[in-house]
């Protein structure tokens, strides 16, 4: 009971924090990940399954520790820093790590057609699109709270799962088997069940405007994810760090706009890094690494794996919070976790015959 | 919210009413069902699927109207009659309907080895076993409430779903595919989710004795159901009405014992039918017909179909109650219903290759 109450307050912050950060929710390889990445380019057939597992595990662990860090930072006191500068820092850090990884690749393999930074207008012209989609979604987020309260918004966010599945099918033209579709519906129902709390029923009183906005936001978010996958997969031999560099450049650009619009005065008067603590730095580092993991998952797996990974992370966070913060798990959480587990199982056994 | 509160009080009564009635939860053919039954014996191969669907639908509709009748009778006032005499009446009515159906069969087909009432000791000796199992379970029911409250008991009752599946596999040696097992776990989780209410979390505080008793009760109930199926299916050509007649004779016998133990004085002083109203008669009729439907499902389908049927009936009851009694459905109900629906779908697509 206590767990859910605190979690709801927290997860709203996770939402605002995470969603505004989303333009850069793609990746680059951190120094430690670089080597596996660059070798993977060479012998990718053999290592593909291994790589897929590693990036999925990394995303799951990073996403779950992300929520825990936010709870921890909240317990330590209120946010003193401006969220927009933190998001910009995340983008900048990812951009920097991309360049470091690229530099190492250039040193070991030399500059090739696939790993050189310079690009054509045709190639780069699609890169701002995900960032624009996330920006529109973040704008809508300010308006939806006129119709929906924060816990109800948490529930409605699970529509993302369905929209990602549908757009993945339509845009990337990849097939899911009937059992995998059933598993996807279960994933959505299971995640929502795990998040149920005594005030969840409010969501049923959501007015039609709220529903429309929630659905539009889910579509925008799903579209941005699927579009990013399409960009990254369009040229499989292209170095992921170059692709990320260009994605993050636009992420920085759009976050710069956000700083100017929202926090211009605060940054001018108090400075860019005002209120940053050790935990703020940890959170920025975690977000940057999570971004890397998301991008890796997009390159070596797909959006479906990403959705499963972040859903399992949500459950992991709750379980870890029991030990770290003494939260209590509800019966709904156990039931939702059971449904999510069965969904993961069904997704893996329900592969369509000529998979991928 | 209101729905769930009222439903919990009611469904506890459903429990006590239904469980004590259970020894006779098998069937005979009502006059209208008789013809389809007797013809089915002849051309059973062709009509098997049709018959299976009809009996399943009948069971679903009768079970859902059963709970509605109980809510209705409660609204009309408290039970004035003794539950044990009502249960005895249900058994007696089913016994009578069995005999009527048999009489019609004898007239049309003559007395054969398969439809004659007389039996060997070997054949009849197994018939009291389900009744004994239900009696032990009903005895346990009086003690479990020392450890578990009524809403928590409602939640724990869903263990029946799992125990039925496991015992069905072990005793009847029938195979479920992996996907069907997954579907069965989902059915249990979905039904429990649909019944969640703000006080459901109490169940997590159930002491170990409560868990043990709940599991033993689930096993007894599952065993009784599976054993009944084994008895009925042992001799497929045997007329179902003869099989039911002997089951119900023992049902009457054990209910007679229950009357003597619980309500002897009341029956002696006020009479057997004291407090019976029009709705009491309707309920007895409904219980008798539900018993018929369960028995038909055992003969022409199986325990798994029975569990699905009664689970869907539980959801139907809730939806119908919205219109009849102005109940409100919770978000948990929608989520649980979604999971149950997906489970039904998975059970049907997940058939093992050489099914049955």
Curated annotation (Swiss-Prot), chains A, B:
SUPFAM superfamilies the record matches: Multidrug resistance efflux transporter EmrE
Record carries keyword Signal: no
Gene: CSTLP2
Stretches in topological domain Lumenal: 74-82, 147-149, 197-211, 261-277, 336-356
Positions in the Cytoplasmic compartment: 1-52, 104-125, 173-175, 233-239, 299-314
Keywords associated with the record: Golgi apparatus, Membrane, Sugar transport, Transmembrane, Transmembrane helix, Transport
Taxonomic lineage: Eukaryota, Viridiplantae, Streptophyta, Embryophyta, Tracheophyta
Tissue-by-tissue expression: Expressed in roots, leaves and stalks.
Gene Ontology annotations of biological process type: transmembrane transport
Pfam families: Nuc_sug_transp
Principal location: Golgi
Annotated transmembrane regions: 53-73, 83-103, 126-146, 150-172, 176-196, 212-232, 240-260, 278-298, 315-335
Homology family: Belongs to the nucleotide-sugar transporter family. CMP-Sialate:CMP antiporter (TC 2.A.7.12) subfamily.
InterPro entries given in the database record: Nuc_sug_transpt (IPR007271)
Biased composition (Low complexity): 27-44
One GO MF term: transmembrane transporter activity
Its biological purpose: Sugar transporter involved in the transport of CMP-sialic acid from the cytoplasm into the Golgi. May transport important nucleotide sugars such as CMP-Kdo (2-keto-3-deoxy-D-manno-octulosonic acid) in physiological conditions.
Biased composition, class Basic and acidic residues, residue ranges: 1-24
Localization of this protein: Golgi apparatus membrane
Protein name: CMP-sialic acid transporter 2
Family annotation (NCBIfam families): nst
């Amino acid at each position: 009971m206590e767990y859910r109450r605190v979690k709801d307050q927290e997860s709203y912050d996770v939402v605002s924090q995470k969603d505004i950060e989303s333009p850069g929710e793609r990746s680059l390889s951190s120094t430690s990940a670089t080597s596996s990445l660059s070798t993977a380019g060479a012998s990718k057939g053999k290592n593909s399954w291994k790589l897929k597992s590693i990036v999925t595990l990394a995303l799951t662990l990073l996403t779950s520790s992300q929520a825990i860090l936010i709870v921890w930072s909240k317990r330590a006191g209120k946010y003193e820093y401006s969220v927009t500068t933190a998001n910009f820092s995340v983008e900048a850090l990812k951009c920097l790590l991309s360049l470091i990884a690229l530099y190492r690749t250039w040193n070991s393999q030399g500059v090739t057609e696939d790993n050189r930074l310079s690009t054509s207008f045709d190639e780069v012209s699609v890169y701002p699109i995900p960032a624009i989609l996330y920006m529109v979604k973040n704008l809508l987020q300010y308006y939806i709270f006129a119709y929906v309260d924060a816990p109800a918004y948490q529930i409605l966010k699970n529509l993302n799962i369905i929209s990602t599945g549908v757009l993945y099918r339509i845009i990337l033209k990849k097939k899911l088997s009937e059992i995998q579709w059933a598993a996807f519906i279960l994933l959505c129902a299971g995640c929502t069940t795990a998040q149920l709390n005594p005030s969840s029923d409010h969501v049923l009183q959501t007015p039609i405007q709220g529903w429309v906005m929630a659905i539009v936001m889910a579509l925008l978010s799903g579209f941005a994810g699927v579009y990013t996958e399409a960009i990254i997969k369009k040229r499989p031999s292209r170095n992921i760090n170059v692709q990320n560099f260009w994605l993050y450049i636009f992420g920085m650009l759009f976050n710069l706009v956000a700083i100017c619009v929202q926090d211009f005065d605060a940054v001018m008067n108090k400075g860019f890094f005002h209120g940053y603590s050790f935990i703020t730095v940890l959170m920025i580092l975690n977000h940057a690494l999570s971004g890397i993991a998301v991008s890796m998952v997009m390159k070596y797996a797909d959006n479906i794996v990403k959705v499963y990974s972040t859903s399992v992370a949500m459950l992991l966070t709750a379980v870890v919070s029991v030990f770290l913060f003494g939260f209590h798990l509800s019966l709904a959480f156990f039931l939702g976790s059971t449904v999510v587990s069965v969904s993961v199982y069904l997704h893996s056994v329900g592969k369509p015959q000529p998979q991928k």
